[in-house]
């Protein structure tokens, strides 16, 4: 797994190690051990995911801006399994030096890339393509 920092602390791009051959491909979509080894040092604290959600949107549908208020905030690990989606994380943390700034990432079912979004960020996604 490769972890790529963005211009906003708390938002990371996650690229899994993918094994491809003539039969198809395989990769670990999540490993707590690897996440702890590679992401925790960057964030400065550990994260333990307790919920896994999946959604499907028709072409052009925009979902968001959504977020959770304290004490129910959630960190997110987002990826696209089919088609393409533009995912955007917006810093809405009051007093943050990056308040109001955003990071966008085009996630596709072809590259297995994901985006880690910190707590207290708003998120929006737009379905770009369905394969």
Regions found by a protein language model. Give the residues of each.
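Non-catalytic, conserved peripheral segments adjacent to functional cores
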Residues: 1-111
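Conserved metal-binding segment of the jelly-roll/cupin
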Residues: 107-131
